[in-house]
């Protein structure tokens, strides 16, 4: 499918903004040091003659307004004198691209993440522009539909912070008058001070943070495919009920994660490696409400961190209800309180002190997750579909591409009453084909 770039420009804040540098926490330094690519798909809701549908002028005017409170995103990724990454609030602006395609929205299929989807619909930074923190592309399709591709640097914002920005931008765009009450009320003032996640002095590490230990990976990255596996409300309810066995009903998260973990072990054939073979499940957690006091609403930065559960493969694939597997998932997340998060921040500070180059050397690195392991990220509870720019809410929102085999996203459908949850999976092609079969077969049990 061909996409033609029509125009590229930089959009800056509509008012003067402070020029200073923002310190980044260790959680900021340990996310992927790249842009997170997402796509929002909108179907035309008005008449074909509506020339104002997704007007670039309206979008850019609103973007200029939202960059006033969110001015760090108009800056650039830089380094301090010691080489530690930081955000330089230069006000240089964000990239805004308009494009068009002779294809239709339906030609995109089910919008499963892929490198092609990212290449077509999300702007990419070349080496010279790698420090740009936010980039957007609006692609107009022959059918009248539109795709907004967003690329926000992960060092600058995690998923919730990025959604706060896009949703506030959309709310301002809905106020076509430009400066009325709706726009003023829409602005969620971001919290810019990241020192709330600074380590204690002296550090006090009270937990084992194995998720941040350097483990031997599986060598080079394997080729992988991605797929979206939808789960209906009825399937979710059946899984939660059957998985509990004689105990209490499982939560959606623990039931689905346990189900995915078991199916992945079976699809990958891990059980044949021997009963003592181990598998580790990584999960991404949010520190915002786990801290006491909680982080301020609108925290602009990364508050996400890793948690994990480890088990023998034989225990995961054992016949019977999912309850035992779900218990492992629940146990791994139950302990993630204020004390745990503070211990993690201190652990990372100690790791940085011991690293070559200090904090400047603290980064996620090129570690490759072993094929025995799984990494699940849940987008449940996030405001994924609130980006209404004045022409309706998105019909679809999701990742444009995934990074590695074994990565799984749990993405809720729009709150239209159907209660659907999409399981988005990246896995080597052979295992993925088996995973699809096992995934739905297990739901019938």
Curated annotation (Swiss-Prot):
* Pfam families xrefs: Transferase
EC no.?
Answer: 2.3.1.-
List the disulfide bonds in this chain: none
Query: Is tRNA processing there in the keyword field?
Result: no
Q: Which residues does UniProt mark as catalytic?
A: 154, 388
Q: Which UniProt keywords apply?
A: Acyltransferase, Transferase
**GO molecular function terms attached to this record:** acyltransferase activity, transferring groups other than amino-acyl groups; hydroxycinnamoyltransferase activity
| UniProt note on tissues of expression | Expressed in leaves.
Question: Keyword Acyltransferase, does the record have it?
Answer: yes
UniProt similarity note: Belongs to the plant acyltransferase family.
Summarize the protein's role.
Answer: Hydroxycinnamoyl transferase that catalyzes the transfer of an acyl from p-coumaryol-CoA to putrescine, to produce coumaroyl putrescine.
| Identification of the protein by name | Putrescine hydroxycinnamoyltransferase 1
Q: What is the lineage of its organism?
A: Eukaryota, Viridiplantae, Streptophyta, Embryophyta, Tracheophyta
